[in-house]
């Protein structure tokens, strides 16, 4: 029984190698603006200089402030 499972596992790995699974590096970035060189959250209109974070949602400005 174990040898049959081994043969089945070998066949499955040959047909569908682990390299065919997409890795995290292949996924698009959630926030492409963070990848640019000129991204400065301090210049955002929602940036709170006292708390050093943005008062808006994280999809709008990074780093976003923790909820109160």
Curated annotation (Swiss-Prot):
Fetch the InterPro entries from UniProt.
Conotoxin
Compartments, record wording: Secreted
List the Gene Ontology MF annotations in alphabetical order. Answer: ion channel inhibitor activity; toxin activity
Keyword annotations for this protein, in alphabetical order, are:
Cleavage on pair of basic residues, Disulfide bond, Hydroxylation, Neurotoxin, Secreted, Signal, Toxin
Q: Which residues form the signal peptide?
A: 1-20
Q: Which residues carry this modification: 4-hydroxyproline?
A: 63
Which cysteines pair up through disulfides? They are 53-65, 54-61, 58-64
Propeptide residue range(s): 21-50
Keyword Glycosyltransferase listed? The answer is no
Question: Could you say which tissues express the protein in this record?
Answer: Expressed by the venom duct.
Q: Where does it sit, as one GO cellular component term?
A: extracellular region
Q: Give the protein family.
A: Belongs to the conotoxin M superfamily.
Q: What is known of its domains?
A: The cysteine framework is III (CC-C-C-CC). Classified in the M-2 branch, since 2 residues stand between the fourth and the fifth cysteine residues.
What protein does this entry describe? Conotoxin VnMMSK-01
């Amino acid at each position: 029984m174990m040898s049959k499972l081994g043969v089945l596992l070998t066949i499955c790995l040959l047909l569908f190698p682990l390299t065919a699974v997409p890795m995290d590096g292949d996924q698009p970035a959630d926030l492409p603006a963070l990848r640019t060189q000129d991204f400065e959250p301090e210049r955002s209109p929602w940036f709170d200089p006292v708390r050093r974070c943005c008062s808006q949602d994280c999809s709008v400005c990074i780093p976003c402030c923790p909820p109160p």
